[in-house]
Amino acid sequence: MNLKNLKYLFLLMMSAIVLASCSETDENTDSEYDDWQAKNKTAFAEILVKAKQEGEANGWHVYRNWSMENQPVTPTVNEQEDNIVVQVMQQGEGSAVRPLYTDSVMVSYKGMLKNDYVFDHNFTGDYDVNKAQTSNFIVKGVVDGFATALMKMTHIGDHWMVYMPYTLGYGSSQSSSLTIPAYSMLKFEIVLKGWYTDGKWIKK
């Protein structure tokens, strides 16, 4: 076999390896998101059970969607679609006043899918108060699950991990950024740094 034929054979072999590698990667990526809705529903149900088992004494809380908070419990209230789960990682300081729906807040946050894929953030890795950046936005401008959590935070420096079902997140449609699939349970690590109400900022 001459050198020219050897060169062609080598190129064919490399092409086959590359194609096989791409195919394997695609399969792995696709399989992770197979039955995504069912997997996310199960994941939130498990977190809800854990929160109830651990209890508020251990820093776990279950809160109803802010828009349903004052409504009586009826058969139309779906526990797995109308609640968020909160794990208090650290309690902050200050008064028991809390942000309102029309207030602006200053937060550090990291948004993740159930598999810990980070789709939005203003800090990376473990939260470090000396390094994390902050963002300002109005409470009513975020998804219901995020807004519900913010309106339950009563201390500057409250540091929570918040779990929300897709119904209180981005719903049954894929996000426009293409990074959040439809029916995604979301996890947000949130640190409340302050909020703006009645014409003034409340900060630590």
Predicted features by range, described:
Residues N2-L6, C22-K204:
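Cross-family detector of peptidyl-prolyl cis-trans isomerase
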Residues K7-M14:
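Sec-dependent signal peptide hydrophobic core
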Residues I17-S21:
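C-terminal motif of bacterial Sec signal peptides marking the signal peptidase cleavage site
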